């Protein structure tokens, strides 16, 4: 079992988030930490992550993301709670096109990251 698991930009690509996080949780030691970074399911995330990143900027191949698989923070928290993962912190992550930098933010409308502890 592991002390820390990083599920970074993965859950928005899996077919069954509940099963994926169940299996991830089973691999985590008690009191271990799981970090989950993903995309919120909002109109803004559709515009930025799919239209912007795939079609306009062409950072990713078209079809990389399926908006139906994006996960709202409240839904992620519930799934994690059902798998013995307690939310410790949740923040938005915002990318600045001008500075080419990411920053932690209270705005979780596109990208966000959660820190969960195995109980």
Task: Annotate each predicted stretch with a short phrase.
Residues 38, 55-75:
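Acceptor-substrate binding/catalytic loop of class I
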């Amino acid at each position: 079992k592991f002390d820390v698991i990083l599920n970074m930009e993965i859950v928005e690509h899996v077919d069954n988030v509940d099963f994926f996080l169940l299996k991830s949780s089973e691999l985590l030691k008690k009191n271990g930490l799981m970090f989950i970074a993903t995309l919120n399911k909002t109109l803004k995330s559709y515009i930025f992550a799919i239209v912007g990143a795939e079609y306009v900027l062409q950072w990713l191949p078209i079809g990389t993301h399926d908006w139906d698989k994006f996960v709202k923070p409240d839904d992620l928290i519930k799934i994690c709670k059902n798998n013995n993962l307690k939310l410790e912190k949740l923040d938005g992550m915002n990318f600045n096109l001008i500075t080419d930098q990411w920053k932690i933010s209270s705005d979780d409308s596109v990208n966000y990251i959660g820190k969960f502890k195995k109980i």
